[in-house]
Amino acid sequence: ASDVYKRQIFSNKSGAGGSIGIGFAVPSNMVKTVVDSVEKGKVIRPWLGATGQTIDSDLAREFGLKRPAGVIINEVYPESSAVDAGLKPGDIVLSIDNKSVEDRDVLRYRIATLALGKTFSMEVIRNGKPAILRFKTKAPLTKPQPNTLEVTGRNPFNGAVLANLSPAFALDNGLDDMKRGVVIVRSRRGSVAERLGLKKGDIVLTINSKKISEVKNFKDIVLSLIHISE
């Protein structure tokens, strides 16, 4: 769809391919971001590397805000744009690139429609005082490498597929991009892992009180347990 000046405003989109009088549209700035990244061979949207909670009426009163709007940051991911900007837990994000941030969904949208590799402003409230942060947009981190492993043998993880979790891998597989560690990507139908309730998105933290930090570490511990049981 275009405005009166014939500038592209929306791009029509329907997942079903049919039409019953309902219109679908994607904002043109998101289309431009996607088109630019497709020209480089893959759709890559900017990733902030921070998560938080929408400011509701109760939080607005608690922090002395005029109205319930914004996102209070709970966590930032190492080496992310959020860290580069100096964003900290407790900061309240009010706008990105001079565009208001009403809630968590709007924050994600604002970031997703920015151009990669460019510098933008972020308006925050920190300790009750306004501040302007600047950050350069980045693609989701690809470290660590997934090193995907399908588990076999006599152990409770038989039939599970595991991988090292990175923000890029998480987003590609519909997982939480703020989590770290070894993640269950899927469990084969009818497998031991599925029967035990292991499912996509589960994070393996420890096995027999031994911390699991990566796929190699997981594999070594599981193999040692199999050896002990034999």
List each language-model region with its residue ranges.
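Short, small-residue-biased leader/transition segments that mark boundaries at the very start
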Residues: 1-5, 227-230
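C-terminal recognition in membrane/secretory proteostasis and scaffolding
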Residues: 33-230
